[in-house]
Amino acid sequence: MKKILFIIPCVPYPLNSGGNQAFFQMVDYIRHKMSVSVLFYAWTIDEAKRVEKLEDLWEDVDFYTFVKETKEEPDSPLVRNPFYYKWLKKLKMSIERKMRRQLLSTSNSTVDLLKDKDFVREKSVLPNSVYKEFDTRYIDYVTKVAHTGFDIIQVEFYELIALGYVLPQNVQTIFVHHELRYIRNENEMNLFQAIRPSDRMNFLVAKDFEWNALQKYKHIIALTEVDRLLLASYLGREDHIYASPAVVKFESNSETEFIPCVHRRFTFVGYGEHFPNLDAVVWLCKEIVPYLRKCNFEFTLQVVGMGYERYSAELRTACPEIELVGLMAIKSVMV
């Protein structure tokens, strides 16, 4: 049986996002056909504990978890009084949190939210698209695990694209490109209120980095046929570039009963940190809600999904009809 290692930049549990659900479905399917191992990057100890849930569900899968946050920092400096130093660190973190809250509160106005903010630039991934150095402990860990006899190593998400430089050359390496970063950067830049010279520089440097990093993988998987064709043009070749089949199964013959609307409720579903979802909610509050009020139309604007907490007060001030309901657990979807 072939041995495959998946490397992803998070712990995909609980299943409270589309990405987590898709990865869960994929591993749940392929573990019956291959010997599966998964290497997670956990930002905190609490996040690492979620792996225990997956271990209970998949007893036939091997898990490797790198934890960025540790109880004791291995490279902590030598200090005269460790207890006093620890207290000062906590005080510093507390002060920084209070400073951040002050910054948010001073910009907490409806005018800022609906008119003055450049949401596209604020949420843009362009500044994070150029190579950022990894934790050396993580690179050592990935290298060690990757050289333990796998037939296939699959890396997912742009955050980890540079790992191709440290993977063994005698295995089949795959990069799953969930979103072509240079395309997203180009699309976002076109929506900036103004494009700066530094934006153009970052775009070109990131585009070159993405091209070179992809050369380190023997196979590349895009999520759509459109992205596959774009990648082929971008890389100058079509071989070993594939479009991924759908993983989630749907009942094609199931009939859905039409239920007429009985509530005057508009529902928007989407994670606020994913562009352009927040921008869309702001657009609804700015362009659509005033028109509905003018027509004396009573309604509720329900927003399902996380990522709107930072602007909750502003959104409710601008649109009292809004309901930020967060996540809604549906048994048929959640595990």
Regions found by a protein language model. Give the residues of each.
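Glycosyltransferases and closely related glycan-assembly transferases
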Residues: 3, 28, 140-153, 161-174, ...
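Short acidic alpha-helix that forms the nucleotide-activated donor recognition element
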Residues: 211-215, 314, 329-335
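Conserved nucleotide-sugar donor-binding subdomain of glycosyltransferases
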Residues: 82-152, 158-161, 193-217
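Conserved catalytic-core segment of nucleotide-activated headgroup transferases in glycan assembly
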Residues: 243-330
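Donor nucleotide-sugar binding/catalytic pocket of nucleotide-sugar-dependent glycosyltransferases
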Residues: 174, 200-206, 211, 215-254
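Active-site proximal beta-strand in glycosyltransferases
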Residues: 4, 8, 167-191
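N-terminal subdomain of nucleotide-sugar transferases
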Residues: 1-72, 79, 89-93, 291-295
